[in-house]
């Protein structure tokens, strides 16, 4: 519907999403939101008064490196959204002329703006790097048409709001462990709506409807529905079958110990996962050993 030049959203509404902010990210983000609703929060995530406790990952440097690898992959993913035709011309997925440099540089500008925007509102390294993803996703619909400066500002603005969206989910006791909805769902939705503002009136090829705000907004609603409705139905069915989440004891010990079983860090844990108490070394003993 939205990825091909003959798609109904493209032909009738002028839907423009060359970087798949809706077709990929919104569908995945809203699917994740639906699953989170049925899955419920992790043990210990919320207090009786509704306040949230932080459950952080085991290594912030590893998390940041992982996010950087995802961002590097985005340049390949988005670069794959354009085609080099036999006539020595780059075209986007809709058959319109574009350039590889436009995609690459606007991706970089969205990433840079996203880093700054998310850091300004969160002051957290994890959300700063996640903001880079939000920035790229938010400019994805118009990578072929945006000015680089505009791409930077869009990425910064949307990424600044993303941590606040995740905090809003916590108010409703929705535990999105990695911020999938705030990054992909909200980032894709905001990107499509904003592209409808700045790209409204741009013509399409072969007599198709021109890009419009209502077309982009309508396309965003369609993509949200295509993600949320199946996600809710599938997760609800799995919940009723009793297989949506692991038992409480497995959640507390970790799946590495209960399912594999294997220990990620055996040097720091006993055979049943209890922390090993380190033997204190006296200064005199350490000197004697030397």
Model-identified regions with their sequence ranges:
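Hydrophobic alpha-helical transmembrane bundles of multi-pass membrane proteins
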Residues: 1-290
């Amino acid at each position: 519907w939205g990825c091909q030049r003959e798609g109904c959203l493209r032909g009738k509404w002028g839907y423009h999403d060359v970087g798949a902010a809706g077709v990929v990210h919104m569908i995945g983000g809203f699917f994740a939101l639906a699953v989170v609703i049925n899955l419920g929060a992790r043990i210990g995530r919320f207090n009786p008064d509704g306040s949230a406790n932080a459950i952080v990952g085991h290594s912030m440097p590893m998390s940041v490196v992982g996010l950087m690898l995802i961002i590097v992959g985005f340049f390949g993913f988005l670069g794959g959204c354009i085609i080099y035709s036999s006539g020595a011309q780059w075209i986007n997925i809709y058959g319109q002329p574009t350039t590889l440099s436009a995609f690459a540089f606007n991706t970089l500008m969205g990433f840079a703006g996203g880093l700054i925007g998310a850091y300004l509102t969160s002051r957290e390294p994890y959300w700063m790097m996640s903001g880079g993803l939000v920035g790229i996703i938010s400019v994805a619909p118009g990578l072929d048409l945006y000015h680089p400066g505009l791409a930077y500002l869009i990425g910064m603005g949307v990424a600044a709001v993303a941590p606040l969206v995740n905090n809003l989910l916590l108010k409703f006791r929705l535990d999105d462990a990695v911020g999938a909805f705030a990054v992909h769902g909200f980032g894709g939705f905001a990107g499509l709506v904003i592209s409808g503002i700045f790209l409204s009136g741009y013509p399409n090829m072969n007599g198709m409807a021109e890009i419009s705000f209502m077309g982009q907004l309508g396309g965003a609603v369609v993509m949200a529905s295509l993600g949320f409705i199946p996600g809710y139905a599938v997760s609800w069915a799995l919940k009723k079958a009793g297989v949506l989440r692991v038992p409480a004891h497995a959640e507390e010990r970790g799946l590495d110990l209960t399912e594999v079983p294997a220990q990620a860090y055996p040097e720091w844990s006993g055979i049943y996962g209890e922390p090993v108490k380190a033997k204190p070394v006296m200064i005199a003993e350490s000197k004697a050993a030397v």
